[in-house]
Amino acid sequence: MTLKERLNADFKEAMKNKQTVRKETISFVRAAIKQYEVDNREEIDDAGIASILAKQVKMRKDALADFEKAGRTDLVESYNAEIEVLTRYLPEQLSEDSERL
């Protein structure tokens, strides 16, 4: 199952289970994927989707720092939940210990 198929299946599951944060986060990612495909007139592969996911996580982490400084705990919690959803689809990063081996 490709990453795109997995996102679509998880989106449907989130809708059925009324998981709004998960559904909205996956929806944002699906929109970014669709935008890429329309702009470049080509089907995106898993590596491209992983790149989009990494950018989405980075954007949310950058905004998270600003929200923490401003004391917006509601947005901090929301963005943390979105980051958690997004990181489920990213490939696992090698730890520093594994890199040394």
Predicted regions: what is each one?
Residues 1-101:
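N-terminal cationic and glycine-rich segments that engage phosphates or anionic surfaces
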